C-alpha cells in the first residue's frame, strides 16, 4: 500500500512554515506588501482565453522523481507565454517538487500572464509570501484543509488581492465551494496514491455550480482530452509534466495548442 503522500507533505510544510516565521516575521512580510504591483486576474484570463492552458513549471514530483532537475524559469517561463499559455502555475515546494518562491520572483517580470503559486498552503503566512514574490493567485487544496480553515485562507487571499483556485478531487469536497472561490480545480490525481484518472473531471463537472470557472488538473497528456473537457464546461487545463519532460517545454506547448485548434 502506497503511504499517504499528502499527509507527509503537510507535516513537512508545517515544520517549514514555522522555520520561515522564525527567520522573517509575518509583520515583516506585511511591511513588504506595499510596494508589490497589483495582481492580474487569472479567472478573467481563463474565462476569456482561447487556450485556457495553465502551463506548469515544475522540476520534480513525488510520483515521478526528477523530471527536469536543471530547469530554469528564465528560459521556460517566457517560452510558455510566447507559445500561448493563458496562465502559469509555478510549484514552490522545495522538498517534494524541487521548487522555491524564487522561481516566481524570477518569472514575474518576464511575463504578462497571471501566475499561480502552487504549493500546500496551510497558513496565511504563505499568502503574504505569495503576494510579495508577485503571484496573482494561490492554490488551496480541500484535502489538506478543514472547510473553516479553507474559508479563512480564501478570505485572507482576497484581502491581499490574490485569487483562489480551490482544488477538489471528490464530491465530498463540494462543500468547500462558496463565493470566495474564484476557480474550482478538479485534480485527476488522487493525492493519497498519486494515481491519475482524467475521467474524474467528467464525473465531477456536472455537480459543480454553473457559474464556476472550472479547471482540470493533472494527467492531461493529449490535446483531444482538452477538447472533450472544454465541451464538458472546463475553461482551464493545468498541464505540467507533459511539457516539462520534453527538451523544449515551450515548443511542446505550441505543438499541443496547434493540435487543439
Task: Label each region the model flagged.
Residues 122-133, 169-180, 216, 220-239:
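Catalytic cores of alpha/beta
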Residues 57, 64-165, 171-176, 201-204:
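N-terminal active-site wall of soluble small-molecule enzyme domains
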Residues 3-68:
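An N-cap/entry alpha-helix motif that binds or orients negatively charged groups
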Residues 9, 55, 80, 88, ...:
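Conserved, mostly hydrophobic/aromatic
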Residues 129-149, 186-195, 234-253:
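Glycine-rich phosphate-binding active-site loops on the catalytic face of alpha/beta enzymes
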Residues 204-207, 230, 245-261:
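C-terminal helical cap(s) of enzyme catalytic domains, especially alpha/beta-barrels
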Residues 12, 58-60, 93, 120, ...:
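Active-site beta-loop-alpha junctions enriched in small/polar residues
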Amino acid at each position: 500500500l502506497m503511504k499517504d503522500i499528502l499527509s507527509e507533505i503537510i507535516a513537512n510544510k508545517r515544520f517549514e512554515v514555522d522555520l520561515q516565521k522564525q527567520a522573517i516575521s509575518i509583520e515583516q512580510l506585511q511591511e513588504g506588501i506595499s510596494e508589490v504591483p497589483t495582481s492580474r486576474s487569472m479567472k478573467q484570463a481563463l474565462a476569456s482565453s482561447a487556450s485556457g492552458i495553465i502551463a506548469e513549471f515544475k522540476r520534480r514530483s513525488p510520483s515521478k522523481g526528477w523530471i527536469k532537475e536543471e530547469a530554469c524559469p528564465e528560459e521556460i517561463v517566457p517560452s510558455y507565454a510566447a507559445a500561448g499559455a493563458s496562465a502559469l502555475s509555478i510549484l514552490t515546494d522545495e522538498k517534494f517538487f524541487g521548487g522555491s518562491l524564487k522561481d516566481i520572483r524570477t518569472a514575474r517580470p518576464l511575463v504578462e500572464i497571471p501566475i499561480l503559486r502552487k504549493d500546500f498552503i496551510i497558513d496565511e503566512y504563505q499568502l503574504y509570501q505569495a503576494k510579495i514574490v508577485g503571484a496573482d493567485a494561490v492554490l488551496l487544496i480541500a484535502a489538506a484543509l478543514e472547510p473553516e480553515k479553507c474559508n479563512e485562507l480564501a478570505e485572507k487571499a482576497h484581502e491581499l488581492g490574490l485569487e483562489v483556485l480551490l482544488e477538489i478531487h471528490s464530491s465530498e469536497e463540494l462543500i468547500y465551494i462558496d463565493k470566495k472561490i474564484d476557480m474550482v480545480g478538479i485534480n485527476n490525481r488522487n493525492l493519497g496514491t498519486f494515481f491519475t484518472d482524467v475521467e474524474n473531471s467528467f464525473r465531477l463537472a456536472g455537480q459543480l455550480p454553473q457559474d464556476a470557472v472550472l479547471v482540470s488538473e493533472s494527467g492531461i497528456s493529449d490535446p483531444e482530452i482538452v477538447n472533450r473537457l472544454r465541451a464538458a464546461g472546463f475553461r482551464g487545463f493545468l498541464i505540467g509534466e507533459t511539457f516539462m519532460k520534453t527538451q523544449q517545454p515551450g515548443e511542446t506547448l505550441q505543438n499541443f495548442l496547434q493540435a487543439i485548434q
